[in-house]
Structure formats: structure tokens, C-alpha cells
Amino acid sequence: MTNQTARSSKKERYANLIPMEELHSEKDRLFPFPIYDKLRRESPVRYDPLRDCWDVFKYDDVQFVLKNPKLFSSKRGIQTESILTMDPPKHTKLRALVSRAFTPKAVKQLETRIKDVTAFLLQEARQKSTIDIIEDFAGPLPVIIIAEMLGAPIEDRHLIKTYSDVLVAGAKDSSDKAVADMVHNRRDGHAFLSDYFRDILSKRRAEPKEDLMTMLLQAEIDGEYLTEEQLIGFCILLLVAGNETTTNLIANAVRYLTEDSVVQQQVRQNTDNVANVIEETLRYYSPVQAIGRVATEDTELGGVFIKKGSSVISWIASANRDEDKFCKPDCFKIDRPSYPHLSFGFGIHFCLGAPLARLEANIALSSLLSMSACIEKAAHDEKLEAIPSPFVFGVKRLPVRITFK
């Protein structure tokens, strides 16, 4: 590695890029919650010199960071024209615009198509004795829906999913080379997807249609159209958020049902509980483990002084298991009276696509359960492998055996 590359990798050594040192083993990455519990009890707000950031683990502290954008800014890391990394007032105006695509009416219109795609994927799965939930079901479903929303050909779904995965992959370790390789891969992935969506936008300008892309092209904020970089940033965000969050939400729900046959039978006996299973999966196996912010001024959090410009990582997965907020937080309970989890964020950056993710997950799990008598691990000693991302929780593959009706 050249000196220039080394300097670049150190410059890019942002807390989003490398894992916590405590999560060093595959076992810990597959089930990190005991570590979060220990950190939440012993150091609820702590500085990590390796990642040069402050980690926040308590529910109230995490919520405070997320709901105070003036104090904890979203402008961080590698900058793009994405709504995810904007602050008000720019964020407010753009969010109001793009939220039109996720109104209850707009999402409801996708229901039939989601059911059709789900039925097709499960029909294909019937032909196999063992299926990989990720590759055969949880992965294709949201990518197909998103591809259609963005005007991408369905046959490109494997391609765009591959590059979407690259954008959330973390460094394999904390070495300069690993960080530099990861930064290089992310930049290549972002460049590819930028060119990909730039081409689609060009086609929509020449031939408008009644779809999301045309709506975004024709929309105005204060009399101005969105810039191409803003449009591309939103397309990439929707792709990545939909792919990673929804794929892992569905897969994590199935993973838990294979781990707990009692809960699986309870849900089969009353499918009205599917929605509760989805919400409890969001809390118990949160697809997004953490969210990064940057302190805009010297401040205090949890009795700890944080200097202006410091990276602050809010650990949602830890907050979702805070014993001061949830009764028996380490138990998967489908009869919780409420679900104040933070898995879709909080405040102005609450996930726009949450209604769509919930709809897709509910349809996917309901259909899977109604068409089967049993879902179990493909092998008792099946070894799962965690997704190589510091902030996304899920597995690379989830082989299961489904007894179809």
C-alpha cells in the first residue's frame, strides 16, 4: 500500500467503517446482544479510541441523539446528496417531496404486486428440498419491488443487489489495508450505481411515465427542480435501505422462527400475530444496529462531555433491549403491549420506507406460514455467517427446509 493510500485510509477511518473491537468473533457478530448489554450497564456512553467515536447504548440517550439534529448532525462520513445525510431546512423540504411516494395510499397500491411476487417466489421454492431464505425469498422480493419503483429492469436485480451490498459492507478488520479496501469498494459501488441511475433518469427525461422517477424529475422545491445528484442520492438510498433493511427483516424473522418452535406454532395458530412478530423482530433482531451522527457543538450526554466535531454512534440494537424501557428485553414476546423500538430511527430521519418495509415483511411472512406446515433449519449444526457490516444485522445465507402444504 502506498503512503498516499495509507494516509487516505486513515483519513477515512470513520466509525461507520470498522466494527467494534468487542465484536471480534463470528459468534459475537451473530448474536452481539450480551456485549451490548454489558456495555450498556458498564459504560452507557463511552469513547472508543480505535474507531475515534463515542458509542451510546441507553435507550433514552440514543433517542435524545436521534431527535436533536441541531446538536447531532447527519452530515458525516463520505458526503453524498442523500436525504439521509442532510439537516434542516434542506432535509425538511426534500423529505416532504419524496414522502409522496410513501403515503398510505401509495404503499397500498403496491400490495397486489408484492403478493404476486411473493407467490411466485414461494412457488419456485417448492421445487427445492432446501432453500436459502436470503437468495430465494427475502432478497429478491424487496429488490424486485424497488427495481420496479425506480424504473430498473427486473433482470438487473442481481446486479443492483450486489452493488447495494457493497455500500453497507464494513472493513473486515481495523487495519489500514482493510479500511482502504473497503473505502475503495464503496466508492466503486457508489460510482456504478450513480451511473446506472443517471442512465435511467436520462431515459425518463426523454420518455416520462407515471412512476416515481418521473415524479421526482418533475417535482420542485421553492421553484427549483432537484439536482441530478439529489435524484441519484435518493435512488441509491431507496435501493440500499429497501434491500438491506427489508431483506434482513424478513430473514431475521424466519431465523428466529427456526430457533423457537413454540413461537412458530403460536403464530401458525393465529396468523393475526404476524404483525406482532414483525415488530418484535425489529426490536429483538434489529436489521439496523446503529446510526451515526456528528456533534455540532460541545455538549454533555449521559453525564459525559463530548467535544464538537466528535462522531457519535447511537446503538439502536442496544436501546431496543434496554431493561429500563422493555420488560424482559431478552425474551421474544409477541404479546408486548406496545413496540416503542427505534429500529426505523426517530425524529426527522424516521425511515420514510417503514410502511413499505412492514407491508413487504407482513405479506412475506404471512404467505410463507400459510403455505407451509413447518419451517426448520436445513441442518441442526448449520453454521451461519454474519453480514460483514458494522451496522447491519443479518446473515449471508439462511438455509432452511420448508414442509409445504
From Swiss-Prot:
InterPro entries: Cyt_P450, Cyt_P450_B, Cyt_P450_CS, Cyt_P450_sf
Gene Ontology MF term list: heme binding; iron ion binding; monooxygenase activity; oxidoreductase activity, acting on paired donors, with incorporation or reduction of molecular oxygen
Record EC number: 1.14.-.-
Residue positions binding heme: 351
Broad enzyme group: oxidoreductase
Listed cofactors: heme
Alphabetically ordered keywords of this record: Heme, Iron, Metal-binding, Monooxygenase, Oxidoreductase
Pfam families, sorted: p450
Keyword Kinase: no
Role: Cytochromes P450 are a group of heme-thiolate monooxygenases. They oxidize a variety of structurally unrelated compounds, including steroids, fatty acids, and xenobiotics.
UniProt-listed PANTHER family: CYTOCHROME P450 YJIB-RELATED, P450, PUTATIVE (EUROFUNG)-RELATED
Family: Belongs to the cytochrome P450 family.
Protein name as it appears in the record: Cytochrome P450 109
Organism listed in the record: Bacillus spizizenii (strain ATCC 23059 / NRRL B-14472 / W23)
Record gene name: cyp109
